[in-house]
Amino acid sequence: MLICNDKSNPKTLLEEIMALRPWRKGPFEISQIKIDSEWDSSIKWDLVKNATPLKDKVVADVGCNNGYYLFKMLEHGPKSLVGFDPGVLVKKQFEFLAPFFDKEKKIIYESLGVEDLHEKYPNAFDVIFCLGVLYHRKSPLEALKALYHALKMSGELVLDTLIIDSPLDIALCPKKTYAKMKNVYFIPSVSALKGWCERVGFENFEILSVLKTTPKEQRKTDFILGQSLEDFLDKTDPSKTLEGYDAPLRGYFKMLKPSKL
């Protein structure tokens, strides 16, 4: 949890926080008010925080949401930090949080998507984190290509995506929805993902972790509006989504843009 002991008026603060719902990423605590977000993002952060050193590096978080991971990255002493997310509400959440957790204003927040990266930030970053974005892209290869071109030579990508448990070079393409999400297009096997990354040009593909999503990590709270993980799974068989697909399984990976093309 990110904690800030500020002297703000708790009543006013809570009103501001609730007006910015739904809070997907967190949790945060400000003036003893806990923002109990849908996701306990500390679980994912613990899996990737030591993937590569960030000290004195130029770092990006693509799909940064409200900035939770950016604020955590500040603790590792990067040279600079840029977050990318086109969402309007999550930027408002970031603007609310930044005075508490980025008092030196080190973070740049760009309202851009992954497709904008290589044109506006070519060869710019030592490290890019892209967490929970790839399966939302209609063209995952184009997204990987954009990430590749935004990295400097010898730059590293830390990637998190939904995966399927299969030894084959295949991907699940949900017919209409996956776990009630309309914007999920391709969920690859690890082998298929490795092939995609290598076709784009990445090397040294490494599996950091594979983890099932559980209600400990994602659940309904008073700080979101609507449903969460348990509403998306088959109540008679929680190993399946409502659509009959395997329940969410996430893979965490690291890869390298080579020093020479």
UniProtKB/Swiss-Prot annotation:
GO terms for molecular function: transferase activity, transferring alkyl or aryl (other than methyl) groups. Carboxy-S-adenosyl-L-methionine binds at K25, W39, K44, G63, V114, E115, Y135, R250. InterPro entries: CmoB, Mo5U34_MeTrfas-like, SAM-dependent_MTases_sf. GO terms for biological process: tRNA wobble uridine modification. The keyword Secreted does not apply. Keywords: Transferase, tRNA processing. It catalyses: carboxy-S-adenosyl-L-methionine + 5-hydroxyuridine(34) in tRNA = 5-carboxymethoxyuridine(34) in tRNA + S-adenosyl-L-homocysteine + H(+). Its EC number is 2.5.1.-. SUPFAM superfamilies: S-adenosyl-L-methionine-dependent methyltransferases (SSF53335). Homotetramer. Belongs to the class I-like SAM-binding methyltransferase superfamily. CmoB family. Catalyzes carboxymethyl transfer from carboxy-S-adenosyl-L-methionine (Cx-SAM) to 5-hydroxyuridine (ho5U) to form 5-carboxymethoxyuridine (cmo5U) at position 34 in tRNAs. This is tRNA U34 carboxymethyltransferase. The gene is cmoB.
